[in-house]
């Protein structure tokens, strides 16, 4: 467990998260308006979204299906009876004057996610609930010093609010939880998890306490928009609370915002309680009844999940837990890997994926779906190395050409005459030349300066333009020099 080092001793983190995940759906939760990102302001607003008198909400069943699927992968209880409630508050970008949410009877309860800890063990983070709710619009304050603008394109978009128990004990655990959750949502297609676009937002409830003591007063940090900022926001807020408590002051229960530039949290407003929102069942919406048949149908439609893939990669392909975890952290990478791994050495493929391909993708700022190298061609490259057709060094050159052009590796090797030299006769001739040209170095080597061996290997590789089989060069050269 990680502690906060105060001036008077150690303190514990107590952290709970609320994740707002925008549901992947072409239309909003209670209207047929589009959910397309970055559309012109107020171009995707129906009469329902704008709260025109007499307009009634109609529930989008696809959003319900997405919530059920999410509940299933969270190993949670799907409530067959749930109710929509009105959460009443006034804000300019909430035209109804209330938000349709689920307070008393949510669609999902009692789930869990296991995350890796710093000790290498798995820790269970309990999920209290997942409920459906509609998003608010967007207030724009930087267009004029005299007024604000309202864009209602986002108003009414379906959200899943996923609420954890306060089981998280460090900023790193919070980050691991969000990464694991985001990956699960992406695998089942219920949310794209793009925090930069705001389709996944994190609120962190943070308190601190002396080791083993009762829970302290919590503060909520709103709308943290990246994994890195989750860590920074929690670290700052926990340290702020420790400093206050050690100075004899009290913690005020409040909502705070994280300033990305200063890496500090600032007061936003005093924390509201549930009573402040005057929740009551929405009279325009019937209770949501979910039959067993639908739950079973959606369960059968779920894809293979990350933890299942990790287990498969370890057993079937012999990968380490660490390497398997890296591959499954992106569904597209896992799909690419599986297509290639069935055609070549999976361990060698994994090494090349993680070191070479990831490096090039990061450099080009693209994802694996935009990569010009097909899984089949990647497998061909690995087989060329396996069969000693090309050396590892030449393979890197071939790989760079493949990445730029999308050409098949065998064609590149043929066009550029890069086939590895494994003919003993040819290599012995080159070795003889190197020995003849470096007689002084040969004498030094034979007098005990073994480190010169690498120099001779380098000379052979230079003469063959790195086409010589390095394993064979080492053997033949050693035989010659030691004779």
Swiss-Prot record:
Its EC number is 6.3.5.-. The gene is gatB. One of its GO terms (biological process) is glutaminyl-tRNAGln biosynthesis via transamidation. Keywords: ATP-binding, Ligase, Nucleotide-binding, Protein biosynthesis. Gene3D superfamilies: 1.10.10.410, GatB domain, N-terminal subdomain (1.10.150.380). One of its GO terms (cellular component) is glutamyl-tRNA(Gln) amidotransferase complex. PROSITE patterns: GATB. This is Aspartyl/glutamyl-tRNA(Asn/Gln) amidotransferase subunit B.
């Amino acid at each position: 467990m990680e502690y906060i080092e105060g001036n008077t001793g150690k303190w514990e983190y107590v952290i709970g998260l609320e994740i707002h995940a925008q549901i992947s759906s072409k239309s909003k939760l209670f209207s047929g308006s589009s959910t397309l990102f970055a559309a012109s302001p107020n171009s995707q607003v129906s009469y329902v979204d704008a709260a025109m008198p007499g307009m009634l909400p109609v529930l989008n069943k696809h959003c319900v299906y997405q919530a059920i699927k999410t509940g299933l992968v969270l190993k949670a209880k799907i409530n067959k009876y749930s109710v929509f409630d009105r959460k009443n508050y006034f804000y300019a970008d909430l035209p109804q004057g209330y938000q349709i949410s689920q307070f008393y009877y949510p669609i999902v309860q009692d789930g869990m996610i296991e995350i890796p800890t710093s000790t290498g063990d798995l820790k269970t983070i309990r999920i209290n609930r997942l409920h459906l709710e509609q998003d608010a619009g967007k207030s724009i304050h930087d267009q004029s010093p005299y007024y604000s603008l309202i864009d209602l394109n986002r108003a009414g978009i379906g959200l899943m609010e996923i609420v954890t128990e306060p089981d998280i004990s460090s900023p790193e655990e919070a980050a691991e939880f969000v990464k694991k959750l985001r990956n699960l949502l992406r695998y089942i297609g219920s949310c794209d998890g793009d925090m930069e676009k705001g389709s996944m937002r994190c609120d962190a409830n943070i308190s601190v306490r002396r080791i083993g003591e009762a829970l302290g007063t919590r503060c909520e940090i709103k709308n943290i928009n990246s994994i890195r900022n989750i860590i920074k926001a929690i670290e700052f807020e926990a340290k702020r609370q420790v400093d206050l408590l050690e100075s004899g002051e009290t913690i005020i229960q409040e909502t705070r915002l994280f300033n990305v530039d200063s890496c500090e949290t600032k007061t936003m407003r005093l924390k509201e309680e549930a009573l402040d929102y005057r929740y009551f069942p929405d009279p325009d919406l019937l209770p949501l009844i979910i039959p067993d048949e639908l739950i079973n149908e959606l369960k059968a439609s779920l894809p293979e999940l990350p933890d299942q893939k990790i287990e498969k990669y370890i057993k079937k392909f012999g990968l380490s837990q660490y390497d398997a975890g890296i591959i499954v952290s992106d569904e597209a990478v896992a799909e690419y890997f599986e297509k290639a791994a069935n055609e070549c050495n999976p361990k060698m493929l994994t090494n090349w994926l993680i070191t070479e391909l990831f490096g090039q993708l990061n450099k080009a700022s693209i994802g694996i779906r935009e990569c010009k190298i097909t899984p089949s061609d990647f497998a061909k490259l690995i087989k060329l190395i396996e069969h000693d057709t090309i050396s590892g060094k030449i393979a890197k050159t071939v790989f760079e050409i493949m990445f730029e052009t999308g050409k098949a590796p065998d064609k590149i090797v043929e066009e550029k005459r890069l086939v590895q030299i494994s003919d003993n006769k040819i290599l012995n001739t080159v070795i003889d030349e190197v020995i003849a040209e470096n007689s002084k170095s040969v004498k030094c080597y034979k007098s005990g300066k073994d480190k010169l061996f690498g120099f001779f290997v380098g000379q052979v590789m230079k003469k063959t333009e790195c086409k010589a089989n390095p394993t064979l060069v080492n053997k033949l050269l050693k035989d010659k020099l030691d004779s």
